[in-house]
Structures are given as structure tokens and as C-alpha cells.
Amino acid sequence: MKLTPKELDKLMLHYAGELAKKRKEKGIKLNYVEAVALISAHIMEEARAGKKTAAELMQEGRTLLKPDDVMDGVASMIHEVGIEAMFPDGTKLVTVHTPIEANGKLVPGELFLKNEDITINEGKKAVSVKVKNVGDRPVQIGSHFHFFEVNRCLDFDREKTFGKRLDIASGTAVRFEPGEEKSVELIDIGGNRRIFGFNALVDRQADNESKKIALHRAKERGFHGAKSDDNYVKTIKE
């Protein structure tokens, strides 16, 4: 018997669903994986039987488990369950939205935030730098990118930005369209300030000596706004 990877996945799902069903019958509260497997396996089997439509199974999928059938917090983790099931007229995606209703209990790890603004990077001194995109393509900079090493087509005082990042929320970014000029706020990078990667201009501890090396590298590689002593000679073993 030769099975495709998809067929093997469905067999594994069937086994997991049957195991979850037996545990439910024993009164064992199901975890996340077991709950998803039970719902998915049931839909897959009913679709194969060919007596119910996809729409009917979407509704039926919401009746298989109650809040008391699963561990605390599991219901809130499962926003939807989607399974590609084989019907008599072909494969269809059956999506069950909110398959388990919440029981009103607190969700493990849930956060309740105050109804007020959150101050980010509080207590950190910020510097303002004017930046212009002299290139012909948009450039987007993430919150924790070492600003000194951003795209070479961004023109600004690179020395002023050494060891700094954008003063914006984590995971967000600032975008510069071609020819656009605007000011950004920067703060010091935290931690032990060992900067590696990015455009490989530093790759060491961020101190005054490494700043000189980085400026020299940036100027040699054509990064706009990088100024260094033309007579500078590296004296630090890299």
C-alpha cells in the first residue's frame, strides 16, 4: 500500500481524533491538540460518508465539544478549525468558527490592560535626526534595526545614530518613499550593546573605537552620510 504525504497526514489525524474521542468518553479533559483533532476527524469522516453538506458540518462542528470537555484556556485558544475534507463531489474546505464556547473563566496568561495610553521606552533619552531617501525605491526600517547601518541610500548624520534604534513600538516600522525627507527619534540600543549582523559595519561591542571602524567601513562602502578621517588607519584587531 502506497500512501501520499497528504493521505498519511489524514491517517494520523484520524488516529489522534479517535484517541481524543476515547479520552473524552473517559471524562478526561482534552488539551488543544486533542480538541482540534476530535473536531477535524469527525468532520472528515462525516464528509466521507457523504450524507451532510459542508455548511451542515460547519454548524455541527460547533456542537461536538463543550467548555467542560476541555482544559481551562483551551476554548479561547481555538478561534477556528479548518479541514480539507473529501465529499462525494470533491474536496472542500470546512471551517468551523468558534468551535467551543468560552465558559466565562479567566484565560491562563490573559492580560487586562488599563484604559489609558502606554508610554514606550520611558526614561530613555531620544535624539532627533533628519533623514532623506536619495534612492529610487522605498525603504522601510524596523523598530530594532541598528539605525547606523540602514540602507545606504538613506542620507543622514550616521555618526549621530551609532548604537541607536528607532523610538517606536516593537514590531512597527518607519517607511521612507523615494525622495522623502523627515525626522525620526532614536534611542540607545539596550542590553550589553554588542551589535552583530545588519550590514556588518560593526560586528563587535558598540564603543568609541568600534564607531571609528564602522564609520570607515560605511564610507568605503558608499553609505550616504558616513564621514570619517581619510587618514584613519585601523589599529584594532578585528
From Swiss-Prot:
A GO CC annotation given for this chain: urease complex
Region feature Urease gamma, mapped onto this chain: 1-102
Noted pH dependence of activity: Optimum pH is 8.0. Active from pH 4.0 to 10.0. In unbuffered solutions, the dodecameric complex is active at pH 3.0.
EC number(s) per entry: 3.5.1.5
Main location (coarse class): cytoplasm
Domain of life per record: Bacteria
Catalytic reactions on record: urea + 2 H2O + H(+) = hydrogencarbonate + 2 NH4(+)
Disulphides: none
Key words, A-Z: Cytoplasm, Hydrolase, Virulence
Family annotation (Gene3D superfamilies): Urease, beta subunit (2.10.150.10), Urease, gamma-like subunit (3.30.280.10)
GO BP annotation list: urea catabolic process
Other comment: The novel dodecameric structure of the enzyme may allow it to remain active at the cell surface at acidic gastric pH. Within this dodecameric structure the 12 active sites are clustered within the interior of the proteinaceous shell. This may allow a high local concentration of ammonia within the enzyme which may protect the nickel-chelating groups from protonation.
Family: In the N-terminal section; belongs to the urease gamma subunit family. In the C-terminal section; belongs to the urease beta subunit family.
Name of the protein in question: Urease subunit alpha
Organism: Helicobacter pylori (strain ATCC 700392 / 26695) (Campylobacter pylori)
Higher taxonomy: Bacteria, Pseudomonadati, Campylobacterota, Epsilonproteobacteria, Campylobacterales
